[in-house]
Regions:
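Short, Lys/Arg-rich, polar N-terminal cytosolic tail immediately upstream
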Residues: 1-22
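A structural signal for multi-pass alpha-helical bundles of membrane permease subunits
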Residues: 23-238
């Protein structure tokens, strides 16, 4: 009797083990196509591109890090790096600041008006990049620039928006801010909606003013979201 019971228990345990193994291998088989796709489209091209950077121009000889040493020695390389850092830091700062300001304004609007203005504010972000680029090119175009026309009408002077290095940097930063601010706005607005109203009520009962409520309630609750959006935008902008 004992032998029969032990045999049955052993059979059940082996059946359970085989089912677990089959489920585990089934999971591996399910993720295998995605794994192959990632390796083929991401890992292999990345490794191959790194290898190509370590060959000579004719791609006939492996030169190691010589190309990187030559690149670091060029003055143009550091000029490009400096411009990229200035462009990224300036654009991300203004996008994050303006996005937070717009989110705070929209969050205090009535629900119906909030929906309308939220949709209007998202137009720059959802507009096709080619179309928005053509629009901004018309704004900064040297011959018929809309901004230069306004400046001249108010007694100012026309600016070389696309030919002068300084003004070209300003125009590209302004365009990037216009395009990227709605992303920050919608992310911060979603974060504001998740903050419990009880926190603001408690702060108001304690006598906290609007700026104090923002400093001690709103900003701490949005700090993680701000860090994530700034990091993501920095990677994309750079």
């Amino acid at each position: 009797m004992i032998t029969i019971a032990s045999t049955v228990n052993r059979g059940r345990s082996q059946g359970l083990l085989s089912r677990l193994r089959s489920r585990r291998f089934a999971a591996y088989w399910m993720i295998l196509p995605l794994f192959v796709l990632i390796v083929g489209l991401v890992v292999y091209p990345f490794v191959w591109s790194v290898y190509l950077t370590m060959e000579n121009k004719q791609e006939t000889k492996f030169v190691g890090l010589k190309n990187f040493k030559d690149l670091i020695g060029y003055g143009t390389f550091w000029l490009v790096v400096g411009n990229s850092f200035r462009f990224t830091l300036t654009a991300v700062f203004f996008k994050a600041t303006l996005g937070l300001m717009l989110a705070l304004i929209l969050n205090n609007l009535p629900f119906r008006g909030q929906r309308i203005w939220r949709g209007v504010s998202m137009i720059p972000w959802v507009m096709p990049l080619a179309l928005s680029s053509m629009g901004w090119w018309w704004v900064f175009e040297p011959t018929h620039s809309a901004i230069n026309w306004v400046l001249v009408q108010f007694g100012g002077t026309a600016k070389p928006w696309l030919s002068d290095p300084f003004w070209a940097r300003v125009s590209t930063i302004v365009t990037n801010i216009w395009f990227g601010t709605p992303f920050f706005m919608i992310m911060y607005l979603a974060g504001l909606k998740s903050i419990p109203e009880s926190l603001y009520e408690a702060a108001q009962i304690d006598g906290a003013r609007a700026l104090q409520r923002f400093r001690y309630v709103t900003f701490p609750m949005l700090s993680r979201l701000i860090a994530i959006t700034v990091m993501f935008s920095t990677i994309v902008t750079f």
